[in-house]
């Protein structure tokens, strides 16, 4: 069996790659593996899902697998990924299961597992679960019978409990703020408008009528056009877009301009430093964050720590160093004082709280970061490792770094899943960034031609 878990759990085309049989196998293996630490009681699992039509099918398979392994299940229904993590911790469950493929198209789905406390699983535990699936394929576990079979409890007020938790974290009420929220026809459709209204905002909601088929369909954080238009039409101070499982938050100013995760992080970092809650005056971001963020934070006296690409690496750094804020340009923002994973609705609340507290517009607050023009070229290659480290490629990168100096940067990264090398260049002008990126891309193509 190849590697089953990717950077964000198990994902694939539902009922083709991610079948009910595979979902059941993952659930059984997870129940056995994650219950090993404490055999004094039957394991307890919290299970939630987003709005994809396939979620009901996969939920049934996962619940069957868990209960057949002796685990009791708290089924919470349609909720955001961070809500499932929160309820896993609140219920003192042994683990949590979220069925979602986040921002991916509707036909995809995924299985994301949380450890006790609502934290993402470490790589070594995922590897143990994979090994258990392989072992069970040839030697079946002894299954409990009678009273040993797990039971299922439906939690009906999970959404309300989660909303109250979110609103309780807000440092300043949102009275006077008018916001348009794009719920991506996903897991945020109920809780995001409810949380924003509860905190005092006037809310206009769009793409908040999921039908199982329309999740992420030309809406949400990856498709901002409808939100940008709605913000201007309704005269709102801002717009907020979530993705299918609501772990992302991307914003739009009153003029309809995008405010990305880098700018949101900068706004929150300054707010938290003023409040004395930005531990060590440090922000955690990935290497894909725009150089403009680093320049802005340096100017403001805030240290920026960079990690590999992926919110799991941001989370690891936050936990290891005891820091209070981190995230990605894509809108995954993590505030460990209030959540164990990226939480789009939490981020939206704190962003609007800053607007309300300062009386400034989102455009004014976002202006702390001036993003540098960025060019990204995905170069098809025969061997992505060779294409990234060939001497001629490295020489061209070094030449570019000297040319750009402190006013730009180069990031060369082999894709983790495709035969591509990603060439990213930031510079003072888009023309210069494109020229430099094309030169490097040409060297990559020469070093590792396709075919």
Swiss-Prot record:
One cellular component term from this protein's GO annotations in UniProt: cytosol
Signal peptide (from-to): none
Keyword Magnesium: yes
GO biological process: carbohydrate metabolic process; peptidoglycan biosynthetic process; UDP-N-acetylglucosamine biosynthetic process
Residues forming coiled coils: none
Active-site residues annotated for this sequence: 102
Gene3D superfamilies referenced in this protein's UniProt entry, alphabetically: Alpha-D-Glucose-1,6-Bisphosphate, subunit A, domain 3, Alpha-D-phosphohexomutase, C-terminal domain
Residues annotated for Mg(2+) binding in this entry: 102, 243, 245, 247
The enzyme's E.C. designation: 5.4.2.10
Positions carrying Phosphoserine: 102
Functional summary from the UniProt entry: Catalyzes the conversion of glucosamine-6-phosphate to glucosamine-1-phosphate.
Name listed for the protein in its UniProt record: Phosphoglucosamine mutase
Classification lineage: Bacteria, Bacillati, Actinomycetota, Actinomycetes, Micromonosporales
Gene for this chain: glmM
